[in-house]
């Protein structure tokens, strides 16, 4: 009898907790003009200590899948893949590091150099040169501005849910894509979803304000020594 009573109490407590969390107060974004919601989302993202970004982008017609952790004022790190060629990326300040799979190095450096670079990191500038375009992915403000900078006319479709989270949906009339922004609490971006991820990419944002330790790899090879 005591066990049964305890179980009932636990279930009741969980139900109460669940009801409380589902009633989170609206942040008012559902009633704002679409462009203002975008502005608020970018501002919120810029003020966050950290974020996880996963999904895909399209660069020069080529899809790039990614899973990155970005830490404000530090840099970012994570894994990416382009045309099936996997590589890891780290940026710390103005330094960038990349480590490709054997297939990646063979594709971009040739078989001879690839054998020398097996399981090695390359080091270069994050501001200029071969790695600059990649390292912009580890700056949340630049990533969002790039992703949202070319949108068409946006329409605020109001409050809805996305994967169980209360969000505001902004629809791009020209592409059919949708930007989801949190409808409760701080208006962080939640996801950018395109009708054709292969052509336009789709991104998910999460773990806002969570930070991770990002450290430089030891023994990195200077990209300049390879002519990069």
Residue spans for each PLM region:
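Subset-of-secretome marker
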Residues: 3-4, 20-228
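C-terminal motif of bacterial Sec signal peptides marking the signal peptidase cleavage site
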Residues: 15-18
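Exposed boundary/loop context
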Residues: 11-13, 157
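N-terminal export and membrane-targeting signals
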Residues: 1-10
């Amino acid at each position: 009898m005591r066990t049964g009573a305890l179980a009932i109490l636990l279930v009741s407590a969980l139900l109460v907790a669940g009801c409380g969390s589902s009633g989170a107060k609206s942040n008012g974004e559902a009633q704002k003009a679409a462009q203002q919601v975008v502005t608020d989302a970018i501002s919120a993202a810029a003020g966050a200590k950290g974020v996880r970004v996963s999904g895909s982008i399209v660069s020069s017609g080529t899809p790039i899948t990614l899973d990155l952790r970005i830490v404000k004022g530090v840099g970012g790190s994570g894994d990416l893949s382009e045309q099936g060629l996997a590589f890891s990326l780290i940026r710390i300040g103005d330094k960038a590091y990349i480590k490709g799979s054997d297939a990646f190095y063979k594709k971009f450096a040739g078989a001879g150099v690839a054998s020398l670079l097996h399981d090695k990191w390359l080091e270069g500038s994050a501001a200029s040169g071969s790695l600059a375009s990649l390292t912009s992915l580890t700056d949340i403000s630049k990533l969002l501005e790039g992703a949202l900078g070319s949108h068409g006319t946006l329409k605020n479709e109001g409050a809805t849910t996305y994967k169980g989270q209360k969000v505001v949906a902004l629809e791009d009339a020209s592409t059919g894509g949708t930007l989801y922004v949190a409808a409760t609490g701080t208006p962080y971006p939640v996801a950018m979803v395109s009708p054709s991820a292969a052509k336009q990419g789709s991104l998910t944002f999460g773990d806002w304000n969570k930070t991770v330790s990002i450290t430089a790899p030891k023994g990195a090879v200077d990209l300049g020594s390879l002519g990069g």
